[in-house]
Amino acid sequence: MINNRWIIVFDWETDSPNPDTCNPVELAAIPIDPRTLEIKEDRSFYSVIKPPGITKETYFTEERQKTIEWHAKQRGVESSDIIKSWKAGKSEKMAWKSFCDYCKKFNSEKSPGNWYTEPIPAGYNIIGFDLPICSRLAEKHKTKMPFSKVNKMDVMDLMFYWFENLDEPSSFRLDTMRKFFGIQAAQAHEAYSDTVDTAKLLVQFLRFHRRQAKVDKFKGAFKDK
């Protein structure tokens, strides 16, 4: 059952908090070698995306304006800087197809017992937020999902497994986890920075799990119980 499929940690930044209606504005991804657990920053992906309609006044709904202000506050810039950056981004279709091509580079070969070749998606709250966006874009732009549909590694769920019976940390937000573990964020809520920090958390716990996981610890553990 040894995993030989690449793990792709990824993160969307968007123009609203609703995964069903938002427009992506940033996408970052970074691969993790499945055997060494090395974070391959030199093989990362990053794209700023121009949301459809941003050149029109009707784009700037109250919700989007609040989201733009939030992004600006997180990065210590003006709202106009955020808008300028988004306007200079790639089209959504181009960014998504580039990302799909990027993920294909990490497909594995089929072998006995390994019928799923796509990389394993990983990230923070990807089940509730990022993966639904991927599904929506795949349907919209008529592509396949670039990830495995079977396995997924949501680090927020992983944190819940470990800390659900402890007083700390105070929440399961990524910012809270950064502070708790002493991770110095280069730029919180920027897609690439969030991706790198999530990858660090995932790798740390995977290494810990591997040190603990032995066949003889588990095999037959429920026998005669």
Task: Report each predicted region and the residues it spans.
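Active-site flanking residues adjacent to catalytic metal/cofactor-binding acidic residues
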Residues: 10, 124, 153-156, 193
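Short alpha-helix plus adjacent loop in nuclease-associated cores
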Residues: 153-168
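Substrate-recognition/cap helix-loop segment adjacent to the acidic, metal-dependent catalytic center
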Residues: 129-153
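Conserved non-catalytic scaffold segment of RNase H-like nuclease domains
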Residues: 3-8, 13-124, 189
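Short, glycine/acidic-enriched loop or turn micro-motifs at the edges of active sites
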Residues: 14-16, 36, 157-160, 197
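Short, polar/flexible loop-turn hinges at active-site or ligand-entry regions and domain interfaces
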Residues: 80-87, 142-147, 183-187
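Acidic, Mg2+-coordinating catalytic module of metal-dependent nucleases/exonucleases
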Residues: 118-127, 132-133, 137, 167-225
